[in-house]
Amino acid sequence: MEKLTKRQQDILDFIKLKVQEKGYPPSVREIGQAVGLASSSTVHGHLSRLEEKGYIRRDPTKPRAIEILGDNRTETQSVIQVPIIGKVTAGLPITAVESVEDHFPLPASIVAGADQVFMLRISGDSMIEAGIFDGDLVVVRQQQSAYNGEIVVALTEDNEATVKRFYKEKDHFRLQPENSSLEPIILKQVSVIGKVIGVYRDLH
């Protein structure tokens, strides 16, 4: 392979480090901050040189899609770009926004079926005792049924979306918050649209 400049080597090493730490590559902004480049276009230029020299491969249709090639010592994981769908409440229900706001890279090993998984941003504190906080992103596997006690994204009779623990009882459904100061939502009809299988929280 063609020799790299010091800046290109620094960028490649940073990408490898982040893939090793998180299982997916860093953003252009993160790369720029790490190597002292304020301009995203300059970072893109260095990434293009790395690609031309055969060190990485990029998919222009997907954000953060950087694959490390050739003689590298970092075992990369396959990454899936999971859609982030609107906002859903973890307090009082709000209308679900069924549109893709963004995509988030997750290791394929924890996501079975990219077309059946999405993420939602939590608004509210009704699930805090389950470790789900305001502003968190929950990873949701699309499914139309759930076992009692599972945390689900559900649509109420008024087509409002909410994240709660699901219980099917004798003549009704109970959507139970994980906050001891809040009351459950009791409904005759409810539609499960997915099961929460993970939570992502940005600690920065």
Curated annotation (Swiss-Prot):
Q: What is this protein called?
A: LexA repressor
Q: Which SUPFAM superfamilies match?
A: LexA/Signal peptidase (SSF51306), Winged helix' DNA-binding domain (SSF46785)
Annotated site (Cleavage), which positions? 90-91
The record's DNA-binding region positions are 28-48
**Task performed by this protein:** Represses a number of genes involved in the response to DNA damage (SOS response), including recA and lexA. In the presence of single-stranded DNA, RecA interacts with LexA causing an autocatalytic cleavage which disrupts the DNA-binding part of LexA, leading to derepression of the SOS regulon and eventually DNA repair.
Q: Which reaction does it catalyse?
A: Hydrolysis of Ala-|-Gly bond in repressor LexA
Family under the similarity heading: Belongs to the peptidase S24 family.
The positions flagged as active site in the entry are 126 (for autocatalytic cleavage activity), 164 (for autocatalytic cleavage activity)
Does the keyword Transcription feature in the UniProt annotation?
Answer: yes
Give the Gene Ontology MF terms in alphabetical order: DNA binding; serine-type endopeptidase activity
The EC code for this enzyme is 3.4.21.88
* Signal peptide positions on this chain: none
One example of a Gene Ontology biological process annotation:
DNA replication
Q: How does it assemble?
A: Homodimer.
For this protein, the record's HAMAP family field holds:
LexA
**InterPro entries in the record:** ArsR-like_HTH, LexA, LexA-like, LexA/Signal_pep-like_sf, LexA_DNA-bd_dom, LexA_repressor, Peptidase_S24_LexA, Peptidase_S24_S26A/B/C
What keywords tag this UniProt record?
A: Autocatalytic cleavage, DNA damage, DNA repair, DNA replication, DNA-binding, Hydrolase, Repressor, SOS response, Transcription, Transcription regulation
